[in-house]
Amino acid sequence: MEKKICCVTGHRDLPQNQINYVKAALMREIEKAVADGFTCFMSGFVEGVDQYFVEMVMEKQKDDPSLELIAVIPYQKRLDSLRAKGRTYEMLEACHDVVVIREEYQPSVYSHRNRYMYMVEHSNRVIAVYDGREKGRTVRTIRFAHQMKKELREIPVGEIHLPKK
């Protein structure tokens, strides 16, 4: 049976008043993915949504050690800098695999055509935390997921999507 893979994309700069909402929604999506038979989770390890996702999958691994995490890093020196930080070092240690897209930094290394294209191509489901902006990495990743006919689970954020109290 082929492994079912889920990846995440989302914004770094979430409004402070929505972080708890986003974390709760991400956890629900991860739990749904596990219930739907997903066993492998990919993250680009960018601050914000990507790292919240990793922390939550690590939490789920405590109950289900068969769950795998894969880090997808744009270039080697970025991986080295992540390993130098205590918090991200622990996250990387929890990963089943680390994929480094390029050995050396290049101006295009952060392009969606690298890391995020790789993640979408290798995933069955994409979880997107998205605020409706028409420019940026998140919307390009969402468009690519549509192009590739991947299952897309969207978590809306932004002023027009504030959760009711």
Predicted regions and their residues:
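Acidic/glycine-enriched connector segments
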Residues: 1-164
